[in-house]
Amino acid sequence: MDFVLNTIQWLREVPHNFKGEFATVVFDDSADILVYCCVLYILLVFMVPEHIMKNREPFNLRLPFVFWNIGLCLFSFCGAYSCVKNMIALYWERGFYRTTCFFDSSVAYDGEFAFWVFYFILSKIPEMIDTVFLVFQKKPVIFLHWYHHLTVAIFCWHAGHALIPSGLWFATMNYCVHSIMYFYYFMCACGMRKFIRPIAPFITMMQLLQMVAGTLIVLYTAYHSYLGESGCEVDRTSIRLGLVMYGSYFFLFAVLFGKLYLKKQVKPSGTASAYAMSKKRNGEKMA
């Protein structure tokens, strides 16, 4: 019992003892790791289905899928709790402009908030395993799915290297959405799709609203960087990348939402049909 209590106490202390120098070293000295992961991911999406899985039976990965989703759900919930708590305090103390445009190293470089933002960035690489489940179960991998995983990993790594203050908002929003999204996938994987299915449109709407909020935040930083008198510490490369990323996400999620929930069709066609059927049957990833 003492071991369990000591372990829990240790886990509580780890985020508070986090030092930003460690994150700086990772992002400065390990950029090539991101490149390797992205190359392997592209091979997974485009080569494995055609050259490895083409003549094979799909793997039964239901049990690993259950544990994978509950693990990501708990991770996202803990991250959401910490980031929301710290974001509210930061906003209350500094206001929206200073929170979004100026990096507060005393809050976002060391300690609990920095810990969860750092591991949020790193988590975008293992989250690519979502696609592994699709590929090896011979489920369709639509453009939105792999494009989202690939580009968000690249942008987050760049944002971690550049220490953009607006990234605190992005991490907080993403943790919140993912905590609900992965719980939904967990329930579906456990065979409770009929029970949980009614909230599927709500989750897609949350994702869409996240893209709207992200786009507005990037536009806000762009205004203060290019036109505002006081400026903005978000570098302009991050602003341009953010506009392209969030703008494209908004468009793609809006199209997906329209196809899945607004168009009343008996039998949708194309990749949207395959994706919708896959998601209905197996609770697979929306993005």
From Swiss-Prot:
It is a multi-pass membrane protein. A motif (HxxHH motif) lies at residues 145-149. The active site is at residue 148. It holds the Pfam family ELO. Involved in the synthesis of fatty acids. Elongates C16:0 and C18:0 fatty acids to C26:0, with C24:0 being the main product. Belongs to the ELO family. This is Very long chain fatty acid elongase 4. The lineage of its organism: Eukaryota, Discoba, Euglenozoa, Kinetoplastea, Metakinetoplastina.
